[in-house]
Amino acid sequence: MRLYSRPGNDLTHRFPLIADALARLRSRSCIIDGEAVACDDNGLASFERIRYRQHDGDVFLYAFDLIELNGDDLRRDPLQVRKATLGSIVAKARPGIRFNEHIEGDGPTVFAHACKMGLEGIVSKRKYSAYRSGRSPDWLKMKNPACAAVTREAEEDWSK
């Protein structure tokens, strides 16, 4: 198993904790949608540690969705089915891979909590939705305006 960035760069050797976890996945092959996360000394996500390659050995993967499993394309399957399958294949992969639970219900409260934790934001998905790359009417991305990564992204957009 290998770890790739969105543009296709092989990052397997850069993140040893994730690479070790990939070897423990319960599958021959898979494509997981996730995000590499490094935490600060308080246990909160630190964009700076990822950006400046600090503590690469402590970076783990938050697994959000499962796109392909053992050669089978799962993108048309409902989100709740993909999440259940994802949970079962990453169950033994901690601490390098962490399953991102699907929280049903009170989106505004979850978003407020994510903002208090300094997270970049959340993505709300309809539980019966198919997987689509890019934007989807079934997925709503809400960004924390106080997050350093979001602020930097806005500044870069304004400078164009």
Task: Tell what function each PLM region has.
Residues 1-160:
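Catalytic cores of nucleic-acid ligases and guanylyltransferases
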